[in-house]
A protein has these predicted regions:
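Extended, low-hydrophobicity acidic Ser/Pro/Thr-rich
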Residues: 477-483
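A general structural signal for well-ordered alpha-helical packing
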Residues: 443, 484-490, 504-509
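Short secondary-structure junction motifs
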Residues: 195, 454, 500-502
Length: 533
């Protein structure tokens, strides 16, 4: 009986001891408290800096998960709440050789010397810097490398919605065989440095996604992103900003992806070899990565069609006026064109104002048309234009055999384009470029008028030629020829025909086929580049 009681008492004491140890493994610095001694992490534990709490001392490894080889701590968690501070000398958080380290920062993690977070030979670390969080060091802020003869340095994940920066070196620095890293800079996240070194450097088989800002504040001629290993993927998304070149050196198997949205122009200075992909379907070219977002041939085809229909409607209205020698009309229109991803048709709003004038001369009618307007594309791109066209209109309503209408007009459109592109060559990550060019147009058509219930029908053709021109920066365009051929059916019905008023109801069916150049050929700097099909 005494033996059983002794065993029972021993089990109770062991359980109490286990509970005490488990509870004691978690630690914190409370709000309003400043701790000036080093904090040694415990395995499977959480160390928390509460809001208003501070851990600060002129010490290396002020938060320590590694003391010596074989004496590292695994699966530890460090949480810094908003308003909390960790401030040390070098390696503010020492995560060397740790497995499963988690750091969640909403406050400040600072190293007055080198490395705010040291991840040498670490596996599976996760660093989350939340909005408002700051991680910085005088040299490199977050570092991982695989030391010679050390453990694998692999599987690190960094998610940044706050600010991470290095003053004299880099914000994020992976090298020496660090593999399988994932770096995600979210919208609102900022990664920057103030030196000639790369802002972010990744090594091998890693992924970098930027939806925020990566900024080399020393100069855009320095590297914003550097790659020192093979088989990496970089994705630049949304309205992300990159300042500094993309440098792949002599590495291989790297992919550079863009997802800025359909119609967004960009120009990124790169060095090294990349496979380029635009995930929105924009044309992208090799060399220094560029995409035009300038408006495809289909856009010109549509504008030609709108002009042709406008002229045909004008002639129909003129025919309804009996024995009118001279006549004119003004018009204002607004068109909203939705995007179409499959054929890269861009979304735009078209607002224009025009005047059509006609004057009878012997057996023909002289026509002159003026038009001005703005084509406002998505992604900060607009084109202002002014057009003048002139020609003849030949109605043959008195011809008993054919009763045909014919017209032909030619004109010129002066265009002033302005668009904002994303680029890593300026300190803002953006650049406004402009262009002045002209387009020459011809519109012609023939219509068979039917007096019975059979609808009128006809053929119309339009053609435009845009000579070669240069934008103010980076892009040079070769000449482009675009035309279309339309088969149309139309009719109108006179519902009211009194001395004082008339009311017509009409309809038009227009079937159009585009012809001419379907690809845009352009040059970046001095190297001619042809877009992918």
């Amino acid at each position: 009986m005494k033996k059983i009681s002794f065993i029972f008492l021993l089990l109770i004491c062991s359980f109490i001891s286990f509970i005490g140890q488990s509870y004691a493994a978690d630690d914190e610095v409370a709000g309003g408290v400043t701790q000036t001694t080093r904090e040694d992490l415990q395995a499977d534990s959480t160390f928390t800096i509460r809001s208003g709490g501070t851990l600060e001392a002129d010490l290396n490894n002020i938060v320590r998960g590694y003391i010596a080889a074989g004496n590292e701590i695994d699966n530890a968690t460090v949480i810094v709440e908003s308003g909390g501070v960790i401030k040390g000398k070098s390696n503010a958080i020492m995560g060397r050789e740790l497995s499963g380290l988690i750091v969640v920062n909403s406050g400040t993690i600072e190293a007055t010397s080198s490395k705010a977070i040291q991840l040498q030979d670490a596996q599976g670390a996760t660093i989350t810097n939340k909005s408002g969080g700051i991680i910085f060091a005088k040299t490199n802020a977050i570092v991982q490398q695989e030391a010679s003869g050390g453990e694998d340095a692999t599987g690190t994940t960094i998610n940044n919605a706050g600010t991470i920066y290095g003053v004299d070196n880099r914000a994020i620095y992976f090298y020496g065989g660090a593999t399988n890293a994932t770096v995600t800079n979210e919208s609102g996240g900022i990664l920057y440095n103030e030196s000639t070194e790369a802002t972010v450097q990744i090594d091998t088989n890693s992924t970098l996604v930027n939806s925020g800002t990566i900024d080399n504040r020393n100069s855009p001629s320095n590297a914003g992103i550097a790659i020192v290993g093979n088989d990496n993927t970089i994705t630049l998304k949304d309205k992300s900003i990159l300042v500094g070149t993309i440098d792949a050196g002599s590495t291989t198997g790297n992919t550079l992806k863009f997802q800025h949205g359909m119609g967004q122009g960009y120009y990124y200075k790169t060095s090294g070899d990349f496979t380029l992909q635009d995930l929105d379907g924009n044309q992208v070219v090799k060399g220094s990565a560029g995409s035009v977002g300038q408006g495809a041939s289909e856009t010109l085809d549509e504008l030609l069609s709108y002009k042709s229909i406008n002229l045909r409607n004008f002639f129909n209205e003129y025919k309804k006026l009996d024995n009118q020698d001279a006549w004119g009309e003004t018009y204002v229109s607004n068109l909203k064109r939705d995007a179409h991803t499959n054929n890269l048709a861009l979304e735009y709003d078209l607002t224009n104002f025009g005047v059509n004038l006609i004057n009878k001369i012997d057996n023909a009618n002289f026509v002159i048309a003026f038009e001005g307007g703005r084509q406002d594309f998505v992604k900060d791109h607009k084109i202002d234009y002014q057009n003048i066209s002139a020609g003849i209109y030949l109605p043959q309503k008195d011809n008993p055999y054919f009763n045909l209408d014919l017209f032909i007009l030619g004109g010129i459109t002066l265009k002033d384009g302005e668009r904002t592109i994303l680029t890593n060559t300026t300190t803002s990550g953006k650049l406004t470029i402009d262009s002045d060019y002209e387009t020459y147009e011809i519109h012609t058509g023939i219509k068979k008028n039917n007096l019975s219930s059979i609808p009128d029908f006809g053929l119309a053709a339009s053609y435009s030629m845009t000579p070669s021109y240069d934008e103010s920066k980076y892009f040079s365009w070769t000449d482009r020829d675009v035309g279309n051929l339309s088969v149309f059916f139309e009719d109108d019905y006179n519902l009211i025909n009194s001395k004082d008023s008339k009311l017509f109801l009409g309809w038009t069916l227009d079937i159009r086929k585009m012809m001419g150049d379907k690809k845009q050929v352009y040059s970046i700097v001095t190297q001619e580049l042809v877009p992918y099909s």
